Amino acid sequence: MNSKSRTYFYFLFPQNKLVATVLLMASLSFMSCKHQQKITLNNGKCILDFKNSKALTANLKANEFKFVWLKGKLSAESTIDSTTNSFTVSLRMKKDSVIWMSISKLGIEGARVLITKDSVKFTNTINNKYFKGDYTYLSKMLNSELDYEMLQSLLVGNSVEFYDDDEKIKPGIDNCQYTLGTIRKYKLRKVIGKGKELKEPAQSIYLNPETFKITRILFYEFNPGRSFDAHFENYELKDSTQLFPMKMNYLIKAQKNIKIDIEYSKVILNEEQTFPFKIPDNYEQIVFKEKQ
């Protein structure tokens, strides 16, 4: 990158914002669904046949997005508290193995990310720096336990495993959608209304009643009031048989309020990919120190 391009990119995307955005994309890289639903109405209210948790879980699993290789291009906008940045991402994935990203602004690459099951790495090409570590820092930054499976699922609209076993998952219906949760909705409202606290985090998945694709994933920890809310919409048919969410929205409320909006413009399935990633010898390692 020449000096002029480097200066211009740095002005648009300062290092501290770039690092934060890269980490957010690495940690994520899970509105309501707007496609039409053929729901029976009675006096303006939808009517859905009740399904138990076993049936809903089976339908959820059967309709999850399946792939071995994935290549995509997407635009993203991140807001950390009141600071907003937009950028484009070239994404490549091999299921259960590698997530690779090239993050650019105005056509200039500013960062490259490589995520595996046990490591998170990225290079900052603007300042000749790199980060190499595990999920510990990302988890602390977002106040949430993160792992590879969670990141992979959230990037393609698949389910994230519940903390509790399947026998404790409660079925329900909310706003013309099926739900699966670790706490029933009426109990959740009762607890919140009386200002009580639950010892375990509450988790819910919302399902489109026709396709059984996920429209929302919600995690809520009552003490100290942390939440993660993911929405998936604009499902399109890919590979002639599968629905893929072309728009995603993530909202994290913790020490910082973080919002990420993603819109895919291209998704290609099951073409073998490469994951070019190299840390030049002259790059300086980024070391994040915990606040005392």
Each language-model region and where it sits:
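Flexible, processing/modification-adjacent segments and terminal tails
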Residues: 126-197
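Transmembrane beta-strands of outer-membrane beta-barrel pores
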Residues: 76-80, 126, 252
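Sec-dependent bacterial lipoprotein signal peptides
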Residues: 1-33
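An acidic-aromatic
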Residues: 98-149, 288
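Solvent-exposed loop/turn segments connecting transmembrane beta-strands
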Residues: 80-84, 103-112, 223-227, 253-259
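Gly/Pro-enriched, hydrophobic low-complexity segments
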Residues: 35, 39, 168-284
